[in-house]
């Protein structure tokens, strides 16, 4: 939908994979701010801060759950990104960086829906931590049947160990 947003997201994922967690958080903040500007279009001037734009979004919100979550995601990205940039010490905070990636993913989904309108294919996309970390699709994308069959097969290969009873 937007090449610049794609590049920002891709770079944030690379930074995370290389364990540059603070830079990842900063990049997701940039992504969130760019999404905000794109949504507001001409209503946001170059002088408006990220806080100003989040307030504009709050003012024009209709009260839907999707809008509320979108604004919360943007605020989280702003807060985490600012904390990483202005921190006095280096923190290897992989969990916060991972949450930033997840929230930026959600913000991108909401941006796509805002730009193109409701789309069940876009709305059904799921964030996959395992894919991000290992490069392989995680079990989150498997059907219940697939998960069941894998567990069943795994149980056949390694039956539970029995303990000897003491008589």
Predicted regions: what is each one?
Residues 1-166:
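Amphipathic alpha-helical interface elements
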């Amino acid at each position: 939908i937007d090449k610049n947003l794609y590049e920002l997201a891709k770079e944030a994922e690379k930074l995370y994979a290389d364990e540059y967690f603070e830079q990842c958080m900063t990049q997701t903040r940039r992504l969130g701010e760019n999404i905000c500007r794109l949504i507001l279009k001409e209503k946001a001037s170059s002088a408006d801060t990220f806080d100003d734009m989040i307030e504009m979004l709050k003012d024009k919100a209709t009260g839907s759950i999707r809008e509320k979550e979108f604004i919360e995601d943007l605020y989280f990205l702003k807060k985490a990104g600012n904390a990483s940039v202005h921190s006095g010490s280096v923190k290897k905070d992989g969990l916060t960086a991972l949450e930033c990636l997840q929230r930026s993913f959600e913000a991108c989904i909401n941006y796509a829906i805002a730009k193109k309108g409701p789309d069940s294919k876009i709305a059904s996309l799921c964030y996959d931590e395992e894919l991000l970390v290992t490069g392989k699709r995680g079990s989150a994308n498997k059907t219940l049947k697939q998960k069941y069959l894998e567990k069943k097969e795994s149980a056949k290969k390694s039956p539970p160990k029995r303990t000897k009873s003491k008589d």
